[in-house]
């Protein structure tokens, strides 16, 4: 929702303040295929394995999401 940095539905999430729906101090992310222990995973980390004729997708180091490779089938 607007103004939220993270999903405040899970009070046990160590990255997200459930009362404010904001990331806790020092946290870069709260969830996502490229988020590990509240930090963005290193650029080049595989976040989605290739299937069929597709290629692996990799974290970019600046986002919690797993960007699709430009050659996604």
Curated annotation (Swiss-Prot):
Pfam families of this UniProt entry? Answer: Disintegrin
User: Which GO molecular function annotations are given, in alphabetical order?
Assistant: toxin activity
| Disulfide bridge positions per record | 6-15, 8-16, 21-35, 29-59, 34-38, 47-66
Q: Which residues cross the membrane?
A: none
The record's account of tissue expression is: Expressed by the venom gland.
What region holds the Disintegrin domain? Answer: 1-73
Recorded protein name is: Disintegrin saxatilin
